[in-house]
């Protein structure tokens, strides 16, 4: 899965899972992240979310290979960049940053 979703008690752990691409945001990751946040928001048993990255980098920002190939759709209409930045939420999400959060990766952190 490009975005992993786990429940741990009252906490949802949402993990960016593209370590081979430094968790760079592609259109597929953006859609999956928006869906994971929606799942968290709709579960009344969950109180807080944690956004993490798999591997040595939290998130390298935009997937530049996708952009170079002409696929610059790195967000969603509702969630903005990464399917997350402008997504309205009613519950807190904490960024668990281990490793670099570069460019758009930093934007994801700031949106938490």
Go through each PLM region and give its residues:
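Conserved CoA-thioester-binding segment of acyl-CoA-metabolizing enzymes
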Residues: 1-56
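An acidic, glycine-rich surface segment that forms the CoA-thioester-binding/catalytic face
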Residues: 32-34, 38-42, 48, 64-102
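Short glycine-rich anion-binding loops that position phosphate/pyrophosphate groups of nucleotides
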Residues: 55-57, 99-100
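Amphipathic alpha-helical interaction surfaces in cytosolic regulatory modules
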Residues: 56-64
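Short glycine/serine-rich donor-binding loops of glycosyltransferases
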Residues: 105-106
């Amino acid at each position: 899965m490009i975005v992993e979703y786990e429940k741990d008690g009252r906490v949802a752990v949402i993990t960016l899972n593209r370590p081979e691409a430094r968790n760079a945001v592609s259109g597929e990751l953006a859609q999956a992240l928006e869906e994971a946040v929606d799942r968290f928001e709709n579960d009344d048993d969950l109180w807080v979310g944690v956004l993490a990255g798999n591997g040595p980098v939290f998130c390298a920002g935009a997937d530049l290979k996708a952009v170079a190939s002409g696929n610059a759709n790195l967000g969603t209409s509702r969630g903005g960049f990464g399917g997350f930045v402008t997504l309205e939420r009613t519950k807190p999400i904490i960024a668990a940053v281990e490793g670099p959060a570069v460019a758009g990766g930093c934007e994801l952190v700031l949106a938490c």
